[in-house]
């Protein structure tokens, strides 16, 4: 069924806006996946703030012009779903990687971050990135450790002085 020109322009504008705000994109071939499974995937994507787009390849190629995701142009072949991560760069990668494990027909084609197209084998690289919350927690732990050590050292100084004074006192008492 043909799409009207106005509808095509709206689709291109929507995908362009999404691509402009996204941190990463993952491309996958969705052939053989049922509509029920796709609906479940979309629900999970909404929860993770990942935007899924299924558009014609020609419209997608036009939509990504002028964005950092122009590099995905060669991968736009055959039925393709685009998963844009809006807050966490690894969210779309984790989501589609888990979905691909469940559904053998679902095949990841590639991913792009920072204007670089990577193959599907690189999905783990992006999927294992910590979330913002996890990264901040690790940073807090790493920065807290030296401060805690310093506090313990400073708290230990009066105790050491007391022990030295007591030892000197004991020596003088033994000598007397």
From Swiss-Prot:
InterPro entries: Ribosomal_uL10, Ribosomal_uL10-like_sf, Ribosomal_uL10_bac, Ribosomal_uL10_bac_type. The keyword Nucleotide-binding does not apply. Pfam families: Ribosomal_L10 (PF00466). Disulfide bonds: none annotated. Keywords: Ribonucleoprotein, Ribosomal protein, RNA-binding, rRNA-binding. One of its GO terms (molecular function) is large ribosomal subunit rRNA binding. Belongs to the universal ribosomal protein uL10 family. Forms part of the ribosomal stalk, playing a central role in the interaction of the ribosome with GTP-bound translation factors. Part of the ribosomal stalk of the 50S ribosomal subunit. The N-terminus interacts with L11 and the large rRNA to form the base of the stalk. The C-terminus forms an elongated spine to which L12 dimers bind in a sequential fashion forming a multimeric L10(L12)X complex. This is Large ribosomal subunit protein uL10. The gene is rplJ.
């Amino acid at each position: 069924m043909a799409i009207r020109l106005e509808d095509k322009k709206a689709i291109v504008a929507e995908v362009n806006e999404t691509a402009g705000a996204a941190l990463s994109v993952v491309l996958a071939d969705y052939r053989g996946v049922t509509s029920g499974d796709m609906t479940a995937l979309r629900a999970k994507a909404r929860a993770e703030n990942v935007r899924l787009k299924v558009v014609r390849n020609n419209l997608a190629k036009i939509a990504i012009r002028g964005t950092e995701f122009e590099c995905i142009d060669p991968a736009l072949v055959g039925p393709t779903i685009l998963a844009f991560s809006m807050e966490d760069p690894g969210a779309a990668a984790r989501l589609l990687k888990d979905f691909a494990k469940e559904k053998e027909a679902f095949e990841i084609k590639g991913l792009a971050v920072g204007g670089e197209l990577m193959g599907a084998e690189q999905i783990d690289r992006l999927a294992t990135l910590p979330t913002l919350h996890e990264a901040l927690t690790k940073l807090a732990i790493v920065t807290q450790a030296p401060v805690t050590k310093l506090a313990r050292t400073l708290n230990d100084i009066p105790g050491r002085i007391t022990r030295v004074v007591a030892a000197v006192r004991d020596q003088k008492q033994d000598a007397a």
